[in-house]
Amino acid sequence: MYLNACRALTLISVLSLLACNSEPEKKQATPSKEIAKAQTGSWGDQGDGTYINPILNADYPDSDIEQVGDTYYMITSKQHMSPGMPILESKDMVNWTNVGHVFNSLSWAPEYNWDRMNGYSFGTWAGDLAYHEGTWYCYQIDYQHGLMVATSKDIKGPWSKPIMMLPKSEVLDDPAVFWDEDTHKAYIIINTAGKQKEASNTIEGNENRIYEMSWDGTKILDEGKLVYTGMGAEAAKIYKIDGTWYIFLAQWTMGDMSTKPGVKNPKNDRKQIVLRSKESIYGPYEVKTVLEKGTVFNNRSASQGALMQAPDNSWWYMHQLIQNDDIPFQGRPQCLEPVTWVDGWPIIGVDEDNDGIGEPVKTYKKPIDGYPVTAPRTDDDFSSPKLGFQWEWNHNPRNTHWSLTERPGWLRLKASKVLPNEKGYGPNINEWTNNDGSDSDFWRANNTLSQRIMGITTGTAVAKFDVSGMKPHQLAGFVRYGGVFNLLGVEVDEHGKKHLFYMEPMGEKTVGPEITVNDLYIRTSNRSNQAIYEYSFDGKNFKRFGPTFTIAFGKWTGDRLGLFSWNDKEDAGYIDVDWFTYDYDGPKAANQ
């Protein structure tokens, strides 16, 4: 993220804000004229000129935002999902819609392919989105492979194949770039952790280095210079405002070292800090904490995001809530905070306890009035020859084994033989996945298609299936998965008989009634992190099947609603999906 010369023309002088030492004047909230046509709920746009955080209450983590003209563009990480690095756009910072992905596939390594599925938790991590001299840039670090960049003339693509810039041996994560128009130099800051740490640096934590880049943003020109070390310090963003350099970083404050960062512990907090220098991008820097978790989101820390400005020159900050909570099952959502400036420092949110540090707001006036309530699309009737941007595959799909055109108006998922339960296939079993069912067949079954759940209160999704194309040893149906999976579907035995079945996270099956009709409707509902399945043959009368189960965050992924099809013995059989609908307690566009 950077504020280039074109964007700088739209920015108010921060000095005028500093002189006030107060919040920008609050205008009267104006409701959208189209609110009656759309749905609101317990989060996001409320239709009355206000919003409730999180404004994007779903698994859209590690955001970065770039503004071009009157439009804001966001990228978020999505690990091993393909296509990777979702792109969203907004006119008002509150209502966001999906418009594409940076990476059509995770093409740079074999572990992300359908015949390996060995890239769980890796793939696309926190990226940086930039627009410079007519070109879009997306930088990201794959923990297993290193720093890369993709480019495009159009935010909606096509994007180039990634160009590798630095190896994994030198970098860890979270790059951010800046083009300095004053000196005609380009820079990138990277969390190198301890990979280049020298004995002379006795400060505990991650090292963050600034490298000089070529002006075209594709080459590293030097060895980098250390600018900051801190406990878990990462997710840097660079800004130059009125000649002063600011580096925003997320950093852990550990009041209790008995638990790891990221584990629920009220004594620990991943805070937002800011470095400030009036001399050079390399410092020296002053340091200040500008946002802490506060009380409105229980124990969830609030940090890591991007600074923005509205047409009225007010400043705003988008950040995520991290996973240090009992039930962060929806993943890491996005929150929008007002920003005020005091003595040249930003305060993010509202300083509730007057200690000079902001805390997140729960509800606030929208930064920009007049736009309709909307949200990322969820429903699908599969009438388009292309998949909607809400959908992503578990690893790169086997493209010969799915279709939207073989039966127009339906999604066809052909079954492949499940991959072997051997090293190099499926999740790596380690301290984070021990005894969670990661060796179950589901994790090695390719072409599972899914989308994020929305919100944490209630939700109900329904899909209609045609099971007439299924073959012996095939399993297909509906799955909820993130850290664990639970699925309900149809299994065909060796004699060709179809039965309903439920499978729990360790792979144990409960077999249900025989299915002798072609049409099957599966419905799943959740209240908080407790979910159930139901089935129907007519779409009206549903019966419960299987237990109440717990949905969970894991593999750096929140709970997802998905469609699966695999075969235990061979590549054989298919299932057709007519439509998918999803209702939840949150904003939804009128045209869904």
Swiss-Prot record:
<feature type="signal peptide">
    <location>
        <begin position="1"/>
        <end position="19"/>
    </location>
</feature>
<dbReference type="InterPro" id="IPR013320">
    <property type="entry name" value="ConA-like_dom_sf"/>
</dbReference>
<comment type="function">
    <text>Xylosidase involved in ulvan degradation. Ulvan is the main polysaccharide component of the Ulvales (green seaweed) cell wall. It is composed of disaccharide building blocks comprising 3-sulfated rhamnose (Rha3S) linked to D-glucuronic acid (GlcA), L-iduronic acid (IduA), or D-xylose (Xyl). Beta-xylosidase converts Xyl-Rha3S, a product of alpha-L-rhamnosidase acting on Rha-Xyl-Rha3S oligosaccharides, further to Xyl and Rha3S.</text>
</comment>
<feature type="lipid moiety-binding region" description="N-palmitoyl cysteine">
    <location>
        <position position="20"/>
    </location>
</feature>
<protein>
    <recommendedName>
        <fullName>Beta-xylosidase</fullName>
        <ecNumber>3.2.1.-</ecNumber>
    </recommendedName>
</protein>
<keyword id="KW-0472">Membrane</keyword>
<keyword id="KW-0732">Signal</keyword>
<dbReference type="Pfam" id="PF17851">
    <property type="entry name" value="GH43_C2"/>
</dbReference>
<keyword id="KW-0326">Glycosidase</keyword>
<dbReference type="InterPro" id="IPR041542">
    <property type="entry name" value="GH43_C2"/>
</dbReference>
<dbReference type="GO" id="GO:0009279">
    <property type="term" value="C:cell outer membrane"/>
</dbReference>
<keyword id="KW-0564">Palmitate</keyword>
<dbReference type="Pfam" id="PF04616">
    <property type="entry name" value="Glyco_hydro_43"/>
</dbReference>
<dbReference type="InterPro" id="IPR006710">
    <property type="entry name" value="Glyco_hydro_43"/>
</dbReference>
<dbReference type="GO" id="GO:0004553">
    <property type="term" value="F:hydrolase activity, hydrolyzing O-glycosyl compounds"/>
</dbReference>
<keyword id="KW-0998">Cell outer membrane</keyword>
<keyword id="KW-0378">Hydrolase</keyword>
<dbReference type="InterPro" id="IPR051795">
    <property type="entry name" value="Glycosyl_Hydrlase_43"/>
</dbReference>
<comment type="similarity">
    <text>Belongs to the glycosyl hydrolase 43 family.</text>
</comment>
<dbReference type="GO" id="GO:0005975">
    <property type="term" value="P:carbohydrate metabolic process"/>
</dbReference>
<dbReference type="InterPro" id="IPR023296">
    <property type="entry name" value="Glyco_hydro_beta-prop_sf"/>
</dbReference>
<feature type="lipid moiety-binding region" description="S-diacylglycerol cysteine">
    <location>
        <position position="20"/>
    </location>
</feature>
<keyword id="KW-0449">Lipoprotein</keyword>
